[in-house]
Amino acid sequence: MENINTLRETLNQGQKSLSKENIEDLLKDMPRHNSFRYINQGSLTDEYFRFARQTLDDLHVYIVISNTGSPAGEVISLFTKKQYNHASLSFDRNLKTIISYNGGERIYPPGLNMETVKYFNKKRDSSIMAYSIPISSEKKKAVIDTISEINKEGNAYNLIGLVLKFSFSQT
């Protein structure tokens, strides 16, 4: 009986995720979600990195795992079979420095961008978990420096690569 209930839940989730509205939204937005070149150079500003470095006395980083209920997130859930499919990183407790690889709310170019916290609960069935992880000031600085390098080098966000777990990026 438990297997039947699990199958029923999976089918219901699939029906919701693959609804006509979700598919239309994904197809319409597909060009924005599939960058095969590093197009997102410098999306994080010098001001962002100044603020991030001001947090070095806070010996934590903050990880936010979310289920925003977006069409892309719902389809990703079909493949991962996980409720939470998006991760964000912040250097401060108030999430002023929160970033992730995202296409966000019509962000272009998609890639490494600041998150817009208000969109985490845009849909009624959205949910988040936030973690505070201890880190030394030196390691936190190294993380900020690594993100700064990625930001300078450029990056791409590719939904197909995310689902297939294969990087399609080209420099």
Which role does the model predict for each range below?
Residues 1-171:
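Cysteine-nucleophile amide-bond enzymes
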